[in-house]
């Protein structure tokens, strides 16, 4: 009987979860990247939130909060212009960036898959990193 009840409940929970963009708060160091969706049109603004999803402060080497957008092959397409000052995110704090899909050379991105990455450090100077993949469609 328990299996008959728990099966549909587990299925409903899995159906509601978005594997790419879960925001789960955890004990210890953790960082999350959240976008409003996974699929974007060409030249559509992409709002990117970097969230300290852990319980300890995170430190970043500059005011870009370690944000990098690359192709799946690792080629760098975008990183925000940022002051070279150490930046910190307290637990549950977030910072928002908007990418208009303009690349570092001034041209616009093409359709394809892009990886959004952030990298910071916990109080013990251990690297804390997260990445998500988005699609840019015609």
Where are these regions (language model features)?
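Low-complexity, acidic Ser/Thr/Pro/Gly-rich terminal tails and inter-domain linkers that flank the onset
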Residues: 18-40
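The feature marks short-to-medium sequence segments in extracytoplasmic or secretory-pathway proteins
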Residues: 55-94
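Structural beta-strand segments of beta-rich domains
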Residues: 42-46
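Beta-strand-rich interaction surfaces with strong enrichment in secreted/lumenal proteins
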Residues: 35-36, 83-89, 104-106, 123
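Asparagine-centered strand-capping/turn motif at beta-strand->loop junctions
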Residues: 50-54
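Hydrophobic membrane-insertion alpha-helices, especially the h-region
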Residues: 1-13
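Exposed aromatic-hydrophobic patches
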Residues: 96-102
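Terminal connector regions
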Residues: 103-138
